[in-house]
Amino acid sequence: MCIRDSTKIVGLHENGTVIDMLRVKAEDPLTSLYGALGNFLATHSLKLTDIGHIALTGVGASYVDGDIYGVRTIKVEEFPSVGVGGLALSRKERAVVVSMGTGTSLLWAEKGGEIRHIIGSGIGGGTLSGLSELITGVHQYALIRKLCQDGDLSQIDLTIGDMSKGKVGTLPPEATAANFAKLAEDATSADKMRGLVNLVLQAIGTMSVLACRTCGTNTVVLTGALTMLPPAHETFELFTQLYGVEYIIPENATFATAIGAALYSMREDG
């Protein structure tokens, strides 16, 4: 389980294959944790005695002391969970793995080897939510996802093409020169939301390129809730074109940390 403002729970068979995944949101970490566990057991007609062990990760894991309902409970540090989960879902041997959650963390991960924290940033989903409420009055993630789809970036961002008739060095006309520097008077809430999403995703993209240069790789695995934003693929594709970095958003990327915690605990447990 990955416990933050919501709990993501993943059940695995002994061979590491996934049984199911679900997400439960509640007012506090313990309520979401026990709600997620109860929901999962009921959905799959399982008993507590059917569980070999429970692996916890995420900041909310600190609220749990001892075993849960008498089931052996293991706490796994979040960074190894992110690294193992990102590699498992992407089927890569090594990569920079990015966790795009409330904030952003960038890790270097090697399968069966080193997993280390490269750097982190306070820019992430929390930034998007806070600025979104300030600027548009919307902070719910589902509404942010919906609203940004209809936005027009040309109403918000200044591009190379706005300032030059051609390329500037290797930068094409559509590349962003300055976020929010072209804010139009008639910009809609959707336009502003699209600009906010672009600001956050581009900041993460820039950090990931620098992390790749540091680690000597060109492979980035993206995980976390922000991977579900509709413009994510388009934004990171531009980074691929500009810097030759391969961005992978694997299936079930939002559950990467929970999956990684389960796999890591099974590996450490022998």
Where does each model-flagged region fall?
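Conserved small/polar residues in nucleotide/adenosyl-binding loops
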Residues: 1-5
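Short beta-strand scaffold segments in enzyme catalytic cores
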Residues: 7-13, 104-109
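Glycine-rich phosphate-binding loop of actin/hexokinase-like ATP-binding domains
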Residues: 21-22, 75-81, 85-142
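Short beta-strand-loop/turn "lid" adjacent to the catalytic site in phosphate-handling enzymes
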Residues: 22-26, 42-78, 115-117
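Glycine-rich phosphate-binding loops at beta-strand->alpha-helix junctions
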Residues: 56-64, 210-213, 217-239, 254
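Conserved phosphate-binding/catalytic loops in two-lobed NTP-binding clefts
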Residues: 72-79, 237-259
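Glycine-rich phosphate-binding/hydrolytic loop that grips phosphoryl groups
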Residues: 83-89, 128-132, 247-270
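Active-site rim beta-loop-alpha module in soluble metabolic enzymes
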Residues: 133-211
